[in-house]
Amino acid sequence: MTTATRFPQFSQDLASDPTTRRLWYGIATAHDFETHDGMTEERLYQKLFATHFGHLAIIFLWASGNVFHIAWQGNYEQWVANPTGVTPIAHAIWDPHFGKAAVEAFTQPGGGGPVNAAYSGLYYWFNTIGLRTNGDLYAGAIGLLLLAAVFLFAGWLHLQPRFRPSLSWFKNAEARLNHHLAGLFGVSSLAWTGHLVHVAIPESRGQHVGWDNFLTTLPHPAGLKPFFTLNWGVYAQNPDTANHVWGTAEGAGTAILTFLGGFNPNTQSLWLTDMAHHHLAIAVIFIVAGHMYRTNWGIGHSIREILGAHNPPKGTPFGGLLGEGHKGLYDTVNNSLHFQLALALACLGVVTSLVAQHMYALNPYVFMSMDHTTEAALYTHHQYIAGFLMVGAFAHGAIFLVRDYDPEANKNNVLARVLDHKEAIISHLSWVSLFLGFHTLGLYVHNDVMQAFGTPEKQILIEPVFAQFIQASHGKMIYGMDVLLSNPDSLASTAWPNYGNVWLPGWLQAINDPNGSLFLPIGPGDFLVHHAIALGLHTTTLILVKGALDARGSKLMPDKKDFGYSFPCDGPGRGGTCDISAWDAFYLAMFWMLNTIGWVTFYWHWKQLGVWSGNTAQFNENSTYLMGWLRDYLWANSAQLINGYNPYGMNNLAVWAWMFLFGHLVWATGFMFLISWRGYWQELIETLVWAHERTPLAKLIRWKDKPVAMSIVQGRLVGLAHFTVGYVLTYAAFVIASTASQSG
């Protein structure tokens, strides 16, 4: 058999296809290593292992580029001297299309030419971790570049015959878990604690620590003596005062590991010494956890044994209701890369959404909470990424069920029982989604009608009393509920061992600060939008769960698994088999995910605009009906945006105004692929080819491949990609421009 000499070399079938299908299917399956010619399980693991190094190299190269351009074309040193008065610069702009007005609009006062403002938050991170000069940034950029080179080499090396790990090495789950827990999380957290204690904290107190003196500068006056004499409390004594001026010794203490809680009033960020303590605690926990599982030494837990015993006995809660419990899951997870990826994506998705929340509510970076545009950009960015990761988790979960699930190995265990109970699971999710949808929309529409008819007092406004109770129990005083931490006489406030000081002293001050973003006061508008978001989350979950649980087969199509993860239909002779592949569920869920995160970010942004401007009444009064959202959030805040350029000139929002329009264009283009069907494109292509072959110059260029329309699934993918990219581009421009126009 001759090997393919043209793309794709990994598939003989596709390489010999005479149509443009060769290109599109080649691109679509380039990363689906499992389906490549001659692929073995061991080779599959080795290729994936090597690609991880390549992936890391790209990430480090990208990070290096960001740091390098800030050092080269940014204004980092001027910004460090005045972080609340100078706008950080990402990089310079060279654009031959810029006229005089544009050059002036995008040039900062005293600047040498047009620049891009930085809304990434990198400046704040650099400042927090103790970098002070462009030289520090150049050193970081070069270090990241060297690291990228090391990882590229490692990727190449692990593809060489002598350095390819064996399949048994990849399947050694306990050893991998130990190393990832202790090494990846534990030791890296310890190293980060070291950096914070030895470099960042001294720099925050005006003492420079660099490569020249970091081995001779004591981070604490007592040195290591308290550590070895177990007198660790010394490291928490004499923390920075509330009057500490960042980057100077004024008001500075000597503590390196504290438990203050709340924020530094000067920087409006978490105390650096609290964060060092946090990372040290994480390091200890994970290094201990990394010694938990049994490997060559014969000590510790066996995950297989733990899972085998995971079955509550009869007479206890759930006893006897779980069948074989978790038996068989060890091999099921360990032998399926898709299952492992699904679990990893689900965890990472949750963590990324938490990052979005904590970046503003418990802001770790000095002075960043005063840069509202950066805060808004980071929240939106992380929330969208969380959505993509979560949908990806379900997609790979469904691929696992189609390709890797073994019914014999999982007989009557929890996984099999989930599949057996799929009707109950899907119908309950469906009921919840319908309930949330009709009730929430009903309340919004009722309130709209009351507004429209001039009787706003007849709106149905429901106070979120349970959520307010939770806020009050954490110490929020505004509701007057006197419960737990908001009641100084409660057990939470007086508990042993230290009567009232058991809670972090700065916490109550932070949670009750009217200018902060921690536990914002909530009312009827919040109640409604929370339920709208719950509708979106439950419907997205319903679509994804149904897609996964029906991926192997349904009453309509019992042999579905034989058709693979994505198929359009089973021919014209079998009615109702279109749009029911697991891929179609992923495709539909993507729209719901984007929609839901739209509501999440609209809500967050509108509420925060009120907090930042000091006018919280606008959100509170106008978020209880739909016209309020359309008029007072979307329309009112896009007014600045669509005026970025006009017949009379332009301003520094012009680039965002253009991006706003361009995003709409990309988004609208998606419908061209989503609505028209394959035959239409085939006829269009045939007409274009006919015209091409009869045009004097064009006919000199001939295709080697016969042009054919994309498959139905590919057309949908292209449509979805345009819809998604356009949607995100449009909202990114809206968030940045509307916030920057109000906050600078």
Curated annotation (Swiss-Prot):
Chain segments annotated as coiled-coil in the UniProt record: none
What Gene Ontology terms describe what this protein does at the molecular function level? Answer: 4 iron, 4 sulfur cluster binding; chlorophyll binding; electron transfer activity; magnesium ion binding; oxidoreductase activity
Q: Where does chlorophyll a B3 bind?
A: 672, 680
Q: Which GO terms describe its cellular component?
A: photosystem I; plasma membrane-derived thylakoid membrane
Q: Where does [4Fe-4S] cluster bind?
A: 569, 578
* Enzyme class name: oxidoreductase
Subcellular location field: Cellular thylakoid membrane
Instruction: Write the Enzyme Commission number(s) for this entry.
Output: 1.97.1.12
**Physiological role:** PsaA and PsaB bind P700, the primary electron donor of photosystem I (PSI), as well as the electron acceptors A0, A1 and FX. PSI is a plastocyanin/cytochrome c6-ferredoxin oxidoreductase, converting photonic excitation into a charge separation, which transfers an electron from the donor P700 chlorophyll pair to the spectroscopically characterized acceptors A0, A1, FX, FA and FB in turn. Oxidized P700 is reduced on the lumenal side of the thylakoid membrane by plastocyanin or cytochrome c6.
User: Could you identify this protein by its name?
Assistant: Photosystem I P700 chlorophyll a apoprotein A2
Organism field:
Synechococcus sp. (strain JA-2-3B'a(2-13)) (Cyanobacteria bacterium Yellowstone B-Prime)
Q: Which lineage do the record's taxonomy fields give for this organism?
A: Bacteria, Bacillati, Cyanobacteriota, Cyanophyceae, Synechococcales
Gene symbol of the encoding locus: psaB
